[in-house]
């Protein structure tokens, strides 16, 4: 008898028990049997039950042909103990079942076990009757095991039916309170729960700056949670959305290299490079990245909130942390370890060492002295022209100097065009005169002042200026200053910067979030930008911006629409090695206490992906992770390591913006590096999410919550980690713990005073037979064992045989 497999989940054992007992009661053949000159109807022998149940279990998909006959006998014993069956005389509760001709029958009561649920409370006037009936049932049940009586069984059945009718009546009366949930209600609960968990993990007061709730598709979440393999990979019902078989074969070949190359594959030189190029071409030709264009802002914002893009804290004046309670959560971002370049570290130390009075006086001097501002503007113009003429090897890659060379501040006459990227900081500047322009210019860019040409940054931006960045009256201002990404400058951008014909766009959410976080902490955007763009090898190579400007200025306008989002490796051959070392990701970008936050947040975000995209991402991450860790993998690139090549090749097909000029490939590469290191945790299914949704749906069904957003649900799980021990220590603890428990059992037998002496001797002999070493350790000699039972009982003396008195004759 075949049946569908019971799905994994809570109460699976109870469901299996109910399925087997139901099948056994429904299919076990019953007939008349004769025993001890009596006939019994509707019964079966133990041997017949073993045969039939054995065939049932072997043909059941939940058990399989591995079931043995002895296991079937053990299951029948459990049936007898739990009153699924009883002997022909009505006795049950023991496990006296063997493969013989003993007769059994089915009881009148149902053997099914109810799943744990919250029954409605009975009415007050039925509580007393229920308690009396309950007591009587328990008493009759105990008696029925030994001396069953017909009137007792009849009474217990009547009481059970009475209670059953009362519960059914109560269910009917409370049926109004139990709501019928539609599919829309269930989907809304999924959306609500995952957003609440994401907000709690990130620790933000609102998700408005992170994700739009309309972007959350509950159907994708439910599918990704339910349809997974044993390894957690999504299983697609529609195979047309899956990877082609030749791509899967190629991925398996490289993931298991060289073990999978024992087939009839060719072994010519460069075979593995051709296979890798085939896989890369497939993923790069996909119509959209695996994380989709829609969720680009989500993943960028997650990294911003988690500290992936660090904004150092700099307090100034009266603007302290108490002005913004949320800023206290980001105190850890000011650690010296968060700076990935020497220049940014020195800049931060330079700001911290500056005196507050010097900063105030310098700011007042710059604002009040128009001549000083004009001189600074002219000097910055000269620096701009000078940076265009400097060769690629004379400029530090990704430093703040390159930010100056990206725009001509003197020639701008309209607002520049901000890009949709989290690393940009283009800000509309209020003001029409050159005084305001130079004032903001000093706050936004490095300033070269004095004979020594020191790099100077203002440590106190104006709070009023930062608060009025997005006001409507500032949109029409003709001047703007900002930052450009070093890897995405195009010919069109350069023409717009030179001709002053840039169009204004609304800042994207990730940029506004980064700007808001820097505003709260009175810090700068240029410092984290320089920190992220800075290469480890400052003195080597050149920036992609310089190379892009020199190589693309001579191109015609017909090539503007081409994909110009090139990495540092594609733009410059001289910067190949620094870029590859930059993308290796060997040094963690996140601080240790922020790594767990990023993993949990990305775990929830990856559940939002369409199932085909999530499956492809899982398989891709597994492949590149294995390849990067495989020491036997041949070199796939002449100048790059395997890990650097994986990150550089697949960064565009994982994270990409809809407008390709806005892609920050460095950020995408670092995200791929983080996914490679933690893909097993990020791409697994969180169990706590399913539990929270089930509890929330249960509350909704019982009418405790009218809307999904009105109530509370289960709190987040608390993680506790145990100290890992070696295998040898585990084996030692296993043996010692087991022996200690057995020795404790022996002591309990010895000290049990309620146990009769004869029964105690019997148990001790049985214990000595099973565990002789432990018994000998407790009783090393026979004297110690004899002392346990105390003095031997005195033997009664035999009655004295008295001589019968002889009666004298009366004669």
UniProtKB/Swiss-Prot annotation:
Keyword Secreted (UniProt): no
Molecular function GO terms recorded: GTPase activator activity
Limits of the DEP domain: 24-108
Organism annotation: Homo sapiens (Human)
Domain of life: Eukaryota
Gene: DEPDC1
Pfam families membership: DEP
Protein name: DEP domain-containing protein 1A
CDD domains in the cross-refs: RhoGAP_BRCC3-like (cd04405)
Key words, A-Z: GTPase activation, Nucleus, Phosphoprotein, Repressor, Transcription, Transcription regulation
């Amino acid at each position: 008898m075949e049946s569908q497999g019971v799905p994994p989940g809570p109460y699976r054992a109870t469901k299996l028990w109910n399925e087997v007992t139901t099948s056994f009661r429904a299919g076990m053949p019953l007939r008349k049997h004769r025993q001890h000159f009596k006939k019994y109807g509707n019964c079966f022998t133990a041997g017949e039950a073993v045969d039939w149940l054995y065939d049932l279990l072997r043909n059941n998909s939940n058990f399989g042909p591995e079931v043995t006959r002895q296991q079937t006998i053990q299951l029948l014993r459990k049936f007898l103990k739990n009153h699924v069956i009883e002997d022909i005389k009505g006795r049950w509760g023991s496990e006296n079942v063997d493969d013989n001709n003993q007769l059994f029958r089915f009881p009148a009561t149902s053997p099914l076990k109810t799943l744990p649920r919250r029954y409605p409370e009975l009415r007050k006037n039925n509580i007393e009757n229920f308690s009396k009936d309950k007591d009587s049932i328990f008493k009759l049940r105990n008696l029925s095991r030994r001396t069953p009586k017909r009137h007792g069984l009849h009474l217990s059945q009547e009481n059970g039916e009475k209670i059953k009718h009362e519960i059914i009546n109560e269910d009917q009366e409370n049926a109004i309170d139990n709501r019928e949930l539609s599919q829309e209600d269930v989907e809304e609960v999924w959306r609500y729960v995952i957003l609440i968990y994401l907000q709690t993990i990130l620790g933000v007061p609102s998700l408005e700056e992170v994700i739009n709730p309309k972007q959350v598709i509950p159907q994708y979440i439910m599918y990704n949670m339910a349809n997974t393999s044993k390894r957690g990979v999504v299983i697609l019902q529609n195979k047309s959305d899956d990877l082609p078989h030749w791509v899967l074969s190629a991925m398996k070949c490289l993931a298991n290299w060289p073990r999978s190359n024992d087939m009839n594959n060719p072994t010519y030189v460069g075979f593995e490079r051709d296979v890798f190029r085939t896989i890369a071409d497939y993923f790069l030709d996909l119509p959209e990245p695996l994380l989709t264009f829609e969720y680009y802002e989500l993943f960028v914002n997650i990294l911003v909130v988690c500290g992936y893009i660090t904004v150092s804290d700099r307090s100034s004046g009266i603007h302290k942390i108490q002005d913004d309670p949320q800023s206290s959560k980001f105190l850890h971002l000011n650690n010296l370890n968060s700076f990935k370049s020497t220049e940014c570290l020195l800049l931060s130390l330079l700001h911290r060492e500056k005196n507050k009075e010097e900063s105030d006086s310098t700011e007042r001097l710059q604002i009040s002295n128009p001549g000083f501002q004009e001189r600074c503007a002219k000097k910055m113009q000269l620096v701009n022209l000078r940076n265009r003429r400097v060769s690629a090897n004379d400029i530090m890659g990704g430093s703040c100097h390159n930010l100056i060379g990206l725009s001509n501040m003197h020639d701008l006459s309209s607002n520049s065009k901000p890009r949709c990227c989290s690393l940009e900081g283009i800000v509309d500047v209020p003001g029409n005169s050159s005084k305001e322009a130079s004032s903001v210019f000093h706050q936004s860019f490095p300033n070269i002042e004095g004979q020594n040409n020191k790099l100077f940054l203002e440590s106190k931006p104006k709070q009023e200026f930062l608060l009025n960045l997005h006001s409507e009256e500032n949109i029409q201002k003709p001047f703007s200053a900002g930052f450009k990404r070093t890897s995405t400058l195009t010919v069109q951008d350069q023409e717009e910067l030179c001709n002053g014909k840039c169009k204004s766009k609304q800042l994207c959410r990730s940029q506004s979030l980064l700007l808001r976080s820097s505003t709260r902490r009175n810090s700068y955007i240029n410092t984290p930008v320089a920190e992220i763009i800075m290469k480890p090898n400052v003195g080597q190579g050149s920036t992609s911006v310089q190379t892009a400007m020199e190589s693309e200025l001579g191109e015609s306008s017909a090539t503007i629409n081409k994909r110009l989002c090139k990495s540092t490796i594609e733009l410059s051959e001289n910067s190949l090695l620094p870029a590859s070392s930059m993308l290796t990701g060997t040094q963690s970008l996140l601080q240790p206490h922020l790594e767990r936050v990023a993993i949990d947040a990305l775990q929830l975000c990856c559940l939002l992906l369409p199932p085909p995209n999530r499956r492809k991402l899982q398989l891709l991450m597994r492949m590149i992770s294995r390849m990067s860790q495989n020491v036997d993998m041949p070199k796939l690139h002449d100048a790059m390591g395997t890990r650097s090549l994986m990150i550089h090749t697949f960064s565009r097909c994982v994270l990409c913006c809809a407008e390709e000029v806005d892609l920050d490939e460095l950020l995408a590469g670092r995200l791929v590096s983080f996914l490679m290191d933690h893909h097993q945790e990020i791409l697994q299914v969180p169990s706590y999410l399913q539990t929270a949704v089930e509890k929330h749906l249960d509350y909704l069904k019982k009418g405790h919550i009218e809307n999904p957003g009105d109530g509370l649900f289960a709190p987040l799980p608390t993680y506790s980690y145990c100290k890992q021990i070696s295998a040898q220590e585990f084996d030692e603890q296993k043996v010692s713990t087991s022996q200690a428990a057995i020795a404790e059992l022996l002591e309990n037998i010895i000290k049990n005073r309620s146990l009769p002496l004869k029964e105690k001797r019997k148990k001790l002999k049985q214990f000595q037979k099973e565990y002789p070493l432990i018994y000998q350790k407790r009783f090393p000699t026979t004297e110690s064992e004899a002392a346990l039972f105390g003095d031997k009982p005195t033997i009664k003396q035999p009655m004295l045989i008295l001589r019968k008195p002889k009666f004298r004759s009366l004669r």
